[in-house]
């Protein structure tokens, strides 16, 4: 199973482990006791069953719960005072808030810990912007952060304030063997009065734990996210657990605003999320479904869309248009699609140097993606005259780039990642790089593209669920085109079975 659960149920783990390791159930049970004595695992009795935790996750969850509760202090500010200030901000900025958004601002002012959740078009950005302006008027120091570079960049664009990755805010120091230790922790906390973290659905338990260690009591923490996105790649489902535990105040934004209700991307995303029928008559301006039932036919349609139709339609380059697919393997999987798309978008040429690595050929001009967090890679942003404007460490899982140069002599590539970060990328790290003309929907989380194209033709039930479809559709700013079988599409909307993730954070938050 995926390592995304941080707790297992004994009656499920024992038969699975004994089958996997080809040993008897008794032998597995004996191991539990030995490991518990060595403090490698924790056995915890919950109601009628035993839960088994890796010790490191158990302590992380227990400490995360303790720290969250500690931050959850309340401040006494009157309704009238907050409302008066909101009205002033609305006047100045031309924004108007609905009652849910006003509630969110009030809760942010009155609580040390708050969760704000809502889908696309429900006014999260306006709410965050009002909260920022509010605390700014109080003269408070505000930090904005998001789990990925792309999400942080988006947050900067929508708020007009500098947002950083959580890693950068915590001052990543490379740590032992590049594991990524942070300069900021309980002995050197963040000097902020208010910290707002966006795209919380992507934050896993270990990043949450590191973040909380660096926040001192008296700092307000506001967590913003869309709980219906796919859960984080790493273990746990932090945002969902905090919401379900009722351990702190949560404001849910549900109303779709008028300007958003003309967008079928947003309207259909909410229909998918509620399990309602989506009309596929292609009368839309930004949501299309092209019915095709053969993998190769689908691929040809995808190629035409990227190269000819969509760039003009959304005013973007073919490189900006992202193909998102559910799977890695198979006729419409990432691996096969990348091979085909590469030939079509960046064909071989005499003046393009290539580097073969495993079954992939990397070529100058290729669109690529980093697939692991690498805390050691140095990057620089330079002006066109070669002056360094900014530099730093770390290229993270999901960062996209273009290969500008391949240098066999130096055994490295020059890759330009998002935001113009130039990296000397050594061949020995090519394991962490892959072509990115097509990427999995999971990898697209937290990113936004002018247009996305989603091939859909069957797939394993476990994977093809509502959250996956919802995440894919909400990646597009201007246009979503699905190409494939509408039956698969309808099945995904109906399939609400998410792979069950057990995690103990919700239980820990409910304790005492």
Annotated model-derived regions:
Residues 18-81:
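Interdomain "pre-motor" coupling segment immediately N-terminal to P-loop NTPase/helicase cores
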């Amino acid at each position: 199973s995926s390592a995304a659960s941080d707790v297992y149920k004994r009656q499920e783990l024992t038969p699975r482990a004994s089958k996997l390791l080809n040993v008897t159930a008794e032998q597995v049970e004996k191991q539990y006791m030995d490991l518990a004595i060595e403090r490698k695992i924790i056995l915890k009795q919950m109601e009628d069953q035993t839960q088994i935790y890796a010790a490191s996750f158990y302590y992380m969850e227990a400490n995360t719960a303790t720290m969250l509760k500690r931050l959850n202090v309340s401040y006494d500010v009157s309704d009238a005072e907050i409302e008066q200030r909101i009205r002033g901000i609305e006047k100045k900025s031309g924004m108007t808030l609905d009652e849910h958004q006003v509630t969110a601002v009030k809760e942010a002012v009155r609580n040390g810990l708050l969760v704000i959740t809502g889908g696309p078009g429900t006014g999260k950005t306006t709410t965050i912007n009002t909260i920022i302006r509010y605390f700014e008027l109080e003269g408070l120091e505000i930090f904005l952060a998001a789990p990925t570079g792309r999400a942080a960049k988006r947050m900067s664009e929508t708020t007009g304030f500098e947002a950083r990755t959580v890693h950068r805010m915590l001052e990543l120091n490379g740590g032992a063997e590049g594991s990524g230790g942070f300069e900021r922790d309980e002995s050197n906390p963040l000097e902020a009065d208010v910290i707002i973290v966006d795209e919380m659905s992507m934050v896993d338990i270990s990043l949450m734990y590191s973040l909380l260690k660096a926040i001192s009591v008296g700092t307000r923490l506001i967590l913003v996210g869309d709980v219906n996105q796919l859960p984080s790649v790493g273990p746990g489902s932090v945002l969902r657990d905090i919401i379900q535990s009722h351990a702190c105040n949560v404001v849910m934004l549900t109303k779709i605003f008028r300007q958003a209700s003309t967008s079928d991307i947003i309207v259909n995303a909410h229909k998918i999320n509620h399990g309602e029928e989506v009309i596929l008559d292609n009368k839309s301006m930004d949501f299309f479904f092209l019915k095709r039932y053969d993998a190769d036919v689908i691929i040809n349609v995808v190629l035409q869309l990227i190269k000819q139709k969509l760039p003009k339609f959304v005013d973007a380059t073919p490189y900006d248009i992202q193909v998102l697919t559910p799977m890695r393997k198979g006729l419409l999987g990432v691996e096969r699609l990348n091979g085909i798309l590469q030939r079509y978008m960046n064909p071989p040429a005499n003046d393009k140097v290539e580097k073969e690595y495993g079954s992939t050929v990397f070529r100058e001009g290729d669109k690529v993606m980093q697939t692991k967090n690498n805390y050691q890679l140095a990057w620089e942003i330079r002006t066109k005259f070669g002056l360094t404007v900014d530099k730093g460490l770390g290229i993270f899982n999901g960062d996209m780039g273009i290969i500008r140069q391949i240098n066999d002599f130096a055994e490295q590539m020059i890759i330009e990642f998002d935001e113009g970060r130039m990296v000397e990328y050594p061949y020995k790290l090519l394991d962490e790089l892959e072509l990115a003309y097509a990427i999995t929907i999971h990898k697209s989380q937290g990113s936004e593209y002018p247009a996305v194209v989603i091939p859909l033709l069957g797939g394993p039930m476990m994977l093809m669920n509502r959250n996956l479809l919802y995440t894919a559709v909400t990646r597009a700013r201007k246009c979503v085109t699905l190409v494939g079988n509408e039956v698969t599409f309808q099945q995904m909307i109906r399939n609400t079975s998410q792979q069950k993730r057990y995690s103990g954070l919700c239980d820990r938050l409910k304790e005492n």
